[in-house]
Regions:
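Long, charged amphipathic helices and adjacent flexible linkers at domain junctions
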Residues: 53, 297-315
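Conserved phosphate- and dinucleotide-binding cores of soluble alpha/beta proteins
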Residues: 1-299
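Flexible domain-boundary/linker segments
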Residues: 87, 125, 161, 200, ...
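Long, contiguous binding/interaction regions
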Residues: 307-463
């Protein structure tokens, strides 16, 4: 560990050093000159090692969500624990990742062996893994010994936000203990047990935010270990705030990922409730209303009780442009509204059967706030994560009396005729079958040739 050890050695009145042949020799700024040491003790002993943590289904699901947010060529920083370990395993399909992190672990070594971590596209210290501390197995220490591809530096360099911000696609990934509905994060201690001291988490959160195409991701299970307490709370109490709400962007639980950047307090509350454990959403909703985070007239949408169907997510490429297909969430209300306003008059009539000129938020909430079973809305989006815009919508609303669902679609003009409608109806059909729905009903004008052609192209019986 170079971390703060080098600074301590440079500042201390008396410096004692142990010479241990088991200690790996690392490059970088990890040396103390013998003339600066007052006492030398020669003593060999095994180094502290830690093994792999127990497998966790929660951690594996969170890891899959996070892996979708990490692009090829990203430089990553990641914390310690079960979930970060699962995240590193989930990144095994990526290419040309780089490492600039506090903690070097066995998972980094494994990704280097697989060729996932190359450090070729970092922008700073290219070709080098940069860290300040290593903790892992004996194999990790052997891997580090005299390895020219690994350099250790003190915390004043590794944790410097200005240095972190110089990296290409810098992604910080850290574990939060608790987050409140405004976005304030507690991460370093339990109430009344403030033993862990300061962390470097905020340094990486801010450095990643300043980096070009950088991202800050916070991960946490939705509940504590016994499932009796939500880790998403209305207001943090008796707990130190490690990350202010103004610095928080992506938050990920096993129930999904949300981006809080640029969101109002009400939008933040809705977003975080949507990824809380379903058993606590009702309580959080009513507490948020009482705390003034949600307006009094807001109702508890069914989507806050539904389980987000992550299996319906898909990324496709159309004419060289990446499109993300995914179910709508409560925080999509504004972008769905913007999509409808961007439609031309003809497309508005095709979708709503009259010249509709106003799309009130109350109406749009019926599209974005869904239960994913009786009603489902799929969105096609383009753009960077957190700033994507809707270019296509496919939705169904279930009629239990007929065991049929009514479907409707709208596609932005520049994306019409590119197959988005087929993708949306294929995924809607698969979801409907899984939910036991017998078929679809669609109402359209006889002049809407593109919609008629779409339905006739499907491998379904058309009546």
């Amino acid at each position: 560990s170079v971390d703060i050890t080098l600074a301590a050695a440079q500042s201390a009145d008396i410096v004692s050093a142990q010479v241990n042949s088991h200690m790996p020799r690392t490059l970088g700024r990890s040396f103390v000159h013998v003339n600066d040491v007052d006492v030398i003790v020669e003593h060999d002993e095994e180094l502290l090692t830690i093994g792999a943590t127990a497998d966790s289904q929660q951690a594996n699901i969170i890891a899959k969500h996070i892996a979708r947010l990490v692009d090829d060529g990203s430089t990553i920083q990641i914390g310690l624990g079960t979930t970060p370990q699962a995240v590193m395993l989930a990144l095994s399909g990526k290419n040309d990742l780089g490492i600039h992190t506090q903690f070097l672990t066995d998972e980094v070594m494994h990704l280097v062996a697989r060729g996932v971590i190359t450090n070729r596209r970092k922008g700073v210290n290219e070709g080098k893994i940069i860290a300040s501390t290593a903790i892992g197995s004996k194999s990790l220490y052997e891997f580090m010994h005299d390895n020219p591809g690994i350099e250790l530096y003190p915390s004043d360099y590794v944790n410097n936000p200005a240095v972190i911000a110089q990296h290409n696609k810098m992604v910080s990934m850290n574990v939060a203990m608790t987050i409140d509905l405004s976005g304030q994060v507690a991460a370093d201690a339990l109430p009344s047990n403030l033993f862990s001291g300061l962390t470097g988490m905020l340094d990486f959160v801010r450095g990643a935010a300043q980096a070009e195409n950088g991202k800050s991701i916070l991960m946490l299970p939705s509940t504590n270990r016994n499932g009796k307490r939500s880790r998403i709370v209305t207001v943090l109490a008796d707990t130190a705030v490690v990350i202010p709400r103004s610095d928080v962007s992506y938050v990920v639980t096993e129930y999904g990922a949300v981006n809080l950047f640029g969101k109002s307090l009400q939008e933040r509350a809705v977003a975080l409730i949507s990824i809380a454990h379903p058993d606590f959403r009702d309580q959080l909703f009513h507490e948020a209303k009482n705390a003034g985070l949600l307006s009094r007239d807001r109702s508890l949408a069914e989507s806050l009780q539904g389980i987000y169907p992550v299996q319906l997510e898909e990324t496709v490429e159309i004419n060289g442009q990446e499109l993300v297909i995914r179910p709508a969430t409560p925080v999509d209300t504004r972008r769905i509204q913007e999509h409808f306003y961007a439609l031309d008059g003809k497309d508005v009539v095709s979708r709503f059967f009259y010249e509709k000129t106003r799309f009130n938020l109350e109406e749009i909430e019926g599209v974005s706030q869904i239960d994913y079973v009786n009603d489902l809305t799929l969105l096609a989006l383009v753009g960077d994560p957190g700033f994507r815009r809707v270019v296509g919508i496919g939705e169904f609303l279930f009629d239990p009396a007929k065991n049929l669902a009514e479907v409707a679609f709208s596609i932005s003009k520049e994306f019409q005729g590119k197959g988005i409608g087929k993708i949306l109806i294929r995924k809607l059909g698969a979801a409907a079958r899984d939910n036991g729905i017998a078929g679809f009903i669609a109402y359209t004008s006889h002049k809407n040739e593109s919609m008629i052609k779409l339905f006739n192209s499907l491998p379904f019986t058309i009546k």
